[in-house]
Regions:
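Flexible, non-catalytic linker and terminal segments flanking ANL/adenylate-forming cores
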Residues: 1-30
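Conserved S/T- and glycine-rich ATP-binding loop of Class I adenylate-forming
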Residues: 62, 84, 101, 132, ...
């Protein structure tokens, strides 16, 4: 039995609190998350998408970085339904990696960057991702998992590389306090591929197949704060 517009609105008590002129119904976008990013870049290219310690990235810049990392991941074998673990704090590289995986039709799997080796291991055993984009501070933690659980491909992220130049230079000052601060933000990550190598790739060809709205985008294990 069809329901009338007046009957439908009567069930939405919150409508009474909308400001005048606020639409009660909107048309939802039908594209993928990457399509939405691309649309924002086309419409608001020069507007700021990300601000990180004062370093600003516009929507146009973000889309280009996403496309470059997507090409780098494609060369690493990532494609449709490939599961890619992301283990980073909130930083620009995290946003870029997220959309780059989705551009390829891959599946993002978020890990809490402060998990213990056992907690990471349980999650890897469950989702079986064999490639991970990882904060340099987490690489050593993953190395303490059982060898058969550690992803064969690790891409390391130095979050300080996304900071303004003045802060990056400041983190090189030869003082105890600065050394401690830098040590809290970045570690050496041998036998990994630096994220910057992906950013150095040419943008992925626009003809590369895109995911559909029915494609799996994320396997979400964390509480949603990452």
């Amino acid at each position: 039995m069809a329901i009338s517009a007046s009957e439908l609105n009567a069930t939405r008590a919150w409508n009474a609190f909308y400001a005048p002129g606020t639409p009660k119904d909107i048309d939802l976008p039908t594209g993928s998350l990457y399509d939405m990013l691309e649309g924002s870049a086309n419409r608001f290219g020069d507007r700021v998408a990300i601000e990180f310690f004062g370093e600003e990235t516009t929507y146009a810049e973000l889309r280009e970085q996403v496309d470059r990392v997507a090409e780098g991941l494609r060369l690493e074998g990532v494609g449709e339904r490939t599961r890619v673990a992301l283990i980073m704090p909130n930083c620009p590289q995290h946003v870029i990696a997220f959309y780059a995986v989705l551009r390829l039709g891959g599946i993002v799997i978020e890990h809490n960057p402060i998990y213990t080796p056992d907690e990471h291991e349980r999650q890897f055993r469950d989702h079986e991702a064999d490639i991970a984009i990882v904060w340099t501070k987490v690489v050593a933690t993953l190395r303490r998992m059982r060898p058969d659980t550690v992803p064969s491909r690790l891409i390391s992220v130095d979050i300080t590389r996304a900071m303004p130049l003045r802060l990056r230079l400041g983190l090189r000052l030869p003082t105890k306090a600065v050394r401690e601060k830098r040590a809290a933000l970045v570690s050496r990550a041998p036998e990994t591929k630096p994220f910057e190598r992906l950013l150095a790739c040419e943008p992925i060809d626009d003809s590369y197949p895109r995911p559909t709205v029915d494609s799996i985008a994320v396997l979400q294990y964390t509480s949603g704060t990452t």
